[in-house]
């Protein structure tokens, strides 16, 4: 039997360095700060750290606008700081995964600065340029951050494409020289000892070369999972990822199961695994992110069923509730009030019981919440500020917009990590770049470590279960009680064992009936989120946000 790749039974911890730990008084996190917290991460027992971009960047989009792929931004430290962090992590058995953005570069990148204003620059064809159409933009594609996806270069009269901010110019992957540069960048970091790469919005790199107008949407159907995407990924995988033995995870925007079965194929011909976001759109009524609505629980279960069954035996998924672009999960699908701790544990158990590689976003393991900012000036996020202006222009009241941002802004997850009850949550001795959530005196890592019943130790238990029981990695997926409006229950089967996971997603009790085919079997409780959970699988009344994981012998 072939050996399971390390990442299939791993749990990965995502660090947003700007908000993790400041080693001084700058107010922004840095590499030395991460290094100072490695023992905390070792206590949690995660296998790898994914760092969001720490490359040289003007920080228009918090580092996802890279101006130099081969150097560390001075805000985070130096290359020797990075090398020291890598060595210190490896010494603790923790791998490092770097975030790489190759759909676009910053307009401050040397390639773009050479290309701008000069049609004859050797770097002009590194980007996507089009002539005006009818005296205006080349087509009606929209930027993900609002407005047209095209920006005029006045010196040449041509427009360049930017699917994100105008300071993020899209690279032209049709140009073999661009693909060669990407391979060189990956080689550079792999040679330093980096263990893996997270590829930002990687399924957007292949554009329909006709660049047609979109009569029904914002243009995304012409560049999402585009015509040459699989060819491009196989090329990079064959030439660099496979030879250096790197783990790769692709962020897939608005993708499909069929594409992800290929992106994350078990033969590793493209990537190791994929992130998809369908489950985090269940509170976008009519597809509208910028609205405030309860999440659609039945749809959440349906989506996970579709992906768990569809990827089993074909491809590998990354499992996650949170990241630096999403609100805090306990605020979103759980409870910020009296049930916060059990709700955070329930959400963790439900996700970690699934097949795939779980990702924990910094602070998730202590049940951090959205900050509940009351003023637009508290927000730093470019997307949030743009939406505020757009909604105001549409006539929406400030209170309504702030309520929406309070639920959906990317800054909800970017507030400083809450280390202790000390000033600024122990994040910095200076002025933090983003205001910490006001609840840090109660919700912080120091308090969590001291309390054996905290969310932190529940995550630690889940990580230990995944290492101890191969069924977490290997089992298939079958949903139970499909139409139940409160309970998400599923079984996973492998090697004569059955894993039963039962979760109440609401603050009211719910009656759970053990299915007849599972009755009478021997089983043991692996983990509950109340101190007196039933030891054997049985019908029971689930308490608010109660979650139970049982292992049964068939």
Label every PLM stretch briefly.
Residues 1-554:
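Active-site and adjacent substrate-binding regions of carbohydrate-active enzymes
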């Amino acid at each position: 039997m072939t050996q399971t790749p390390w990442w299939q039974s791993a749990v990965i911890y995502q660090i947003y360095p700007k908000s993790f730990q400041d080693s001084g008084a700058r107010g922004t996190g840095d590499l030395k700060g991460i290094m100072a917290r490695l023992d905390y991460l070792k206590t949690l027992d995660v296998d790898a750290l994914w760092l969001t971009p720490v490359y040289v960047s003007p920080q228009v989009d918090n580092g996802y606008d890279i101006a130099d792929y081969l150097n560390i931004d001075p805000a985070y430290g130096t290359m020797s700081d990075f090398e020291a962090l890598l060595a210190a992590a490896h010494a603790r058995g923790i791998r490092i995964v770097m975030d790489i953005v190759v759909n676009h570069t910053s307009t401050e990148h040397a390639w773009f600065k050479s290309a701008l204003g000069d049609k004859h620059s050797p770097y002009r064809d590194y980007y996507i340029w089009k002539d005006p159409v009818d005296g205006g933009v080349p087509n009606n594609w929209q930027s993900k951050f609002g407005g047209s996806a095209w920006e005029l270069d006045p010196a040449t009269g041509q427009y360049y494409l930017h699917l994100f901010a105008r300071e993020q110019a899209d690279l032209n992957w049709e140009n073999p020289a661009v693909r060669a540069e990407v391979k060189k960048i990956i080689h550079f970091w792999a040679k330093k000892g980096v263990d893996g790469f997270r590829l930002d919005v990687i399924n957007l790199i292949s554009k329909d070369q006709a660049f047609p107008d979109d009569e029904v949407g914002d243009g995304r159907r012409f560049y999402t999972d585009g015509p040459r995407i699989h060819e491009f990924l196989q090329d990079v995988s064959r030439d660099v990822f496979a030879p250096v033995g790197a783990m790769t995870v692709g962020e897939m925007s608005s993708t499909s199961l069929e594409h992800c079965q290929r992106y994350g194929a078990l033969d590793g011909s493209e990537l190791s695994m994929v992130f998809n976001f369908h489950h985090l759109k269940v509170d976008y009524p009519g597809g509208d992110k910028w609205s405030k609505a309860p999440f659609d629980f039945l749809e959440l279960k349906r989506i996970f069923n579709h992906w768990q069954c569809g990827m089993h035996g074909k491809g590998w998924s990354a499992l996650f509730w949170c990241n630096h672009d999403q609100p805090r999960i306990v605020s979103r699908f759980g409870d910020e009030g009296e049930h916060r701790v059990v709700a955070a544990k329930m959400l963790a158990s439900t996700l970690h019981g699934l097949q795939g590689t779980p990702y924990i976003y910094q602070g998730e393991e202590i049940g951090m919440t959205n900050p509940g900012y009351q003023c637009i000036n508290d927000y730093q996020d470019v997307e949030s500020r743009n939406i505020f202006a757009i909604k105001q222009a549409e006539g929406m009241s400030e209170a309504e917009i702030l309520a929406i941002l309070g639920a959906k802004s990317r800054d909800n997850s970017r507030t400083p990590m809450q280390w202790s009850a000390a000033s600024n949550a122990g994040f910095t001795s200076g002025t933090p770049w983003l205001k910490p959530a006001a609840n840090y005196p109660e919700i912080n890592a120091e308090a969590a470590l001291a309390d054996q019943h905290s969310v932190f130790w529940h995550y630690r238990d889940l990580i230990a279960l995944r290492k101890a029981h191969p069924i977490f990695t290997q089992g298939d997926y079958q949903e139970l009680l499909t139409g139940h409006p409160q309970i998400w229950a599923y079984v996973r089967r492998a090697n004569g064992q059955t894993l039963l996971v039962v979760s109440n997603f609401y603050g009211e009790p719910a009656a759970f009936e053990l299915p007849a085919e599972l009755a009478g079997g021997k089983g043991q409780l692996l983990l509950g989120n109340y101190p007196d959970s039933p030891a054997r699988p049985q019908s029971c009344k689930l308490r608010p946000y109660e979650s139970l994981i049982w292992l049964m012998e068939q």
